């Protein structure tokens, strides 16, 4: 019974730490870029897009397809970095344990 109570206490502590970490993820920002930084995208580790910066030379009708491709690439780069930041914090929180459903594997 004591083991069960200990596990419940640990679960409650983990839940509290996870809530705190989720709040911290709102503050963590990453930047993705493409085309030699001609397009940059900034987002939080929770995948909320914060800003997009586009080099003025891409703002021409004939550059439309290039710009579209670079926007997608920069967003994907930022998303990958955000996922990595979130996983690093989750691993620190869980002590490297593999917990199903957390996407740490």
Curated annotation (Swiss-Prot):
GO terms for molecular function: DNA binding. It is found in: Cytoplasm, Nucleoid. GO terms for cellular component: bacterial nucleoid; cytosol. The keyword Magnesium does not apply. Keywords: Cytoplasm, DNA-binding. The keyword DNA-binding applies. InterPro entries: YbaB-like_sf, YbaB/EbfC. Binds to DNA and alters its conformation. May be involved in regulation of gene expression, nucleoid organization and DNA protection. Homodimer. Belongs to the YbaB/EbfC family. This is Nucleoid-associated protein OCAR_7544/OCA5_c05960.
